[in-house]
Amino acid sequence: MCRAVAGVTRFVFTLALGVGSAHVTHAMKKKTSVSEQPEQRTYEVRTFGCQMNVHDSERLSGLLEDSGYQPAANGEEPDVLVFNTCAVRENADNRLYGTLAMVKPMKDRNPGMQIAVGGCMAQKDKDAVVDRAPWVDVVFGTHNIGSLPTLLERSAHNQRAEVEILDSLEEFPSVLPAKRESAYSGWVSVSVGCNNTCTFCIVPSLRGKEQDRRPGEILAEVQALVDQGVQEVTLLGQNVNAYGVNFADEDLPRDRGAFAKLLRACGEIEGLERLRFTSPHPAEFTDDVIDAMAETPNVCPQLHMPLQSGSDRILKEMRRSYRSKKFLGILDKVRERIPHAAITTDIIVGFPGETEEDFQATLDVVEKARFSCAFTFQYSPRPGTPAATMPDQIPKAVVQERYERLIALQERIQAEDNKELVGTTQELLVQETGGRKDAQRHRMSGRARDGRLVHFTPSEDVRPGDIVEVTITDARPFFLIADGPLVNHRLTKAGDMSGAGQTPTTAPIGVSLGVPTIGIKPQADATAAPKNVHEGCGCD
């Protein structure tokens, strides 16, 4: 790919991972021809699911803007509406098709409008999406998000639906441009896919086997973000601490210590103030990663470590490859090296065959672990997973009752631990959004270095992306409050960009580093896509 920006020509090498066979079907339908469509078309991306989907949506937005589309103004109907979907839980099906039914009147009002469905649900359902929602124009999967502009053009030209699902990854998403959501915080993928075989999880069948990016490409993308003022980067992967086992570049040797080395290398990037990662797998979490976290100043004192169940018997049925003793041992090691680390987790309630004794084991581990936050899920059978056909599926009423007990326990723990932070000083990266009542109470919100959400009373010149220090005055289970005067306020480049309505647009990054550009958001009454609906995945 070759692209010129500001007089600089960028040559980007695309990593070829092999193109799987494409499953393509066509459904004839009436459309407005290309010649009748306006020259400058608008788009909106709606995201359902995990952080990987949020980052993929940044790529989709970058692709569309690179192809001449503009973000639709807030409240206006777009010419192209893209759904980036999730398939992890059962209600994902109902949510997608219910939403598609709701937007059909929009399509009826504007026959030239195009609707595209991508992501995990599209990868799973393929042409069934068009069967169930014939007004959909394009269906694309997790392996070929770069095909979206071409599929939209082809569908409009041929006046028929285009469904293209690849069986394996076409190219790393990093070779695509990205319209970043935030001026101060960014996602960077270290890998795609997953080699684990958890019996409840559909993700490996939809995302494929793990493929790891070259370290230099990851560092180049982080540097490109930091050069544009981004202060916080989160490294993304289905199992980040398996990084280095399956490099897509066959010339790179297998390296089980690669993730710890990557953390340390990110620590050398000047201007990167906060580094996070998600999600590791307890079975492969090693001491060298803990050491790298403790010894690299910009790595935040936060760890997301999925538990899923505290019962060793259920963990075995889940095919999780660790037991509760090992899990708690990891937490002990982390807290020994990083005493104030905030540890979060995922837990599934009601896995097939879970007895009251099994559930009590989960409660016991939660009590001992004292998570700062737990993303809890009621087990949802997914067709095609081993757990979906296991005997002894738990009645919904039983699952609900256990779920409520777990929530009550975790809220108590969070309330107790958060109260201990009252009176402490916390450094916050100010967010654009945070609390539902921020405007009503004249507050802003930010994240502490350990990831806790803090609502605070700002001075007049505080902007999203700035760094402030506050004194905690009160605590709730899910957030902290700082209602006193600011201890300190540091203006930042990210704050300047936020104030100007700007976010980075990073160029494709292959072997060489692309030169990032600056994307201008619409004014205050026009919010750029994508619009995200975040749902924790619970599949790590």
Swiss-Prot record:
Positions of [4Fe-4S] cluster 1 binding: C50, C86, C120
Domain Radical SAM core: 180-416
Subcellular location: Cytoplasm
EC identifiers of the protein: 2.8.4.3
Its job: Catalyzes the methylthiolation of N6-(dimethylallyl)adenosine (i(6)A), leading to the formation of 2-methylthio-N6-(dimethylallyl)adenosine (ms(2)i(6)A) at position 37 in tRNAs that read codons beginning with uridine.
Assembly with partners or alone: Monomer.
Protein name: tRNA-2-methylthio-N(6)-dimethylallyladenosine synthase
Originating organism: Corynebacterium urealyticum (strain ATCC 43042 / DSM 7109)
Source organism phylogeny: Bacteria, Bacillati, Actinomycetota, Actinomycetes, Mycobacteriales
Gene this chain is encoded by: miaB
